[in-house]
Structures are given as structure tokens and as C-alpha cells.
Regions:
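Long, low-complexity, charge-biased intrinsically disordered regions
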Residues: 1-187
Length: 187
């Protein structure tokens, strides 16, 4: 149970660029504007994930998972990208923390020296951008932890930002008709 534990979120900057190395050879040319210190016409070898490569998200995830495992977390078998940290010094393991990973964003809750040490390990391995506690946005949801440690989650800002879609009365009556090309483009 994660009662009375501070919630937090963090963002790993340039996540795809810190993923595992590729297991194949990938080459590219520098941009037309050039790169400092790279001769025009050079051929560059990409050794790690890069934005746009199909395996970049997987390479990042594997690196992040390895780092969390090294920090002492265990990946839940029933919910991949959900990690728990147990103190196994007692006869029964005691849950001291949890972390959920979604691409380069993490939401976590935990307490105590073991949890803090694990989080410091994670912070030492990645460039952390924004890290917030108490009230923050995670995956488009506003998360607010109250002083009694209860948690409120809503999507008020997301709903307010939605654009109203006006559908003509005659079109509403054709609810089983396929979308027109204009409708596909507009919505």
C-alpha cells in the first residue's frame, strides 16, 4: 500500500538519445546546414537511439528498465513499465516505493532512505528535466496530493481546451454513414 507517501513526477530529457546501443549498423549524412567539426559529405554512424528510428522507443525503455532494476526496483509481471521497490530485510517484503514509466515521464511514490537512494541512482543516470511534487500534470491529468495524502485526479484543463464540434442536424441523423473526406480532414 502506498498510503502517506509523497507523489512526484519527473521527466527524462533527451530520453531517446540515452537509450541502449543499437545491435545493427545505421549510418546517416549530416544536415545540409552542416554540423560543427564535421566535414561536408561525411557519413556518420548512429550508435544509439535517435528520434525517428523505429527502435528508439524500445532502446530507451530497455535502458530505463535496466537503470530501475539496478536501483533495486522490480518490474511488475502483470503491468509492464510499473516498478515496485521492496525492503526485504523483514520476514515479509515491505513495499517502500513505486514508479510508473510512460515513455520519458515517470510518476512515483515512496518514502524512506531506501527509496531516496534508489531515486538518487535514477537521477544520476539520466538528465532530469522538470521534477514536481504535490500538484502536477502527468499524461494530461492534473494530479493533486492533499495534506492528508489523499489524491485528486482530473482532466479539467484538457476538457476546457477541447474545441466544440458542431454537427449539422441532418448529419446527426446519419450516424451509421461513413465519414466524408471533408469530415476526415476536419476532425
Amino acid at each position: 500500500c502506498l498510503k502517506k507517501r509523497q507523489l512526484g513526477t519527473l521527466d527524462c530529457k533527451t530520453a531517446f538519445l540515452t537509450g541502449r546501443k543499437h545491435d545493427r549498423d545505421i549510418y546517416c549524412r549530416p544536415p545540409k546546414d552542416g554540423l560543427p567539426g564535421v566535414a561536408p559529405g561525411s557519413l556518420l554512424k548512429i550508435v544509439k537511439g535517435a528520434y525517428g528510428l523505429r527502435e528508439a522507443p524500445r532502446l530507451w525503455y530497455l535502458k530505463a528498465r535496466d537503470t530501475l532494476l539496478d536501483a533495486g526496483f522490480e518490474e511488475m509481471q502483470t503491468a509492464r513499465a510499473c516498478f515496485v521497490l521492496h525492503d526485504r530485510k523483514e520476514s515479509e517484503p515491505v513495499n517502500v516505493g513505486m514508479l510508473v514509466l510512460h515513455v520519458d515521464d515517470a510518476c512515483y511514490a515512496g518514502e524512506g532512505p531506501m527509496f531516496e537512494k534508489a531515486m538518487e541512482h535514477i537521477r544520476s543516470k539520466f538528465t532530469i528535466g522538470k521534477e514536481e511534487h504535490g500538484e502536477f500534470t502527468f499524461l494530461g491529468r492534473r494530479v493533486k496530493q492533499n495534506s492528508d495524502f489523499s489524491v485528486e485526479i482530473d482532466q479539467h484543463d484538457y476538457v476546457k481546451a477541447l474545441e466544440r464540434v458542431v454537427v449539422a442536424r441532418e448529419r446527426r441523423q446519419q450516424s451509421t454513414s461513413p465519414l466524408t473526406s471533408k469530415e476526415l480532414h476536419d476532425y
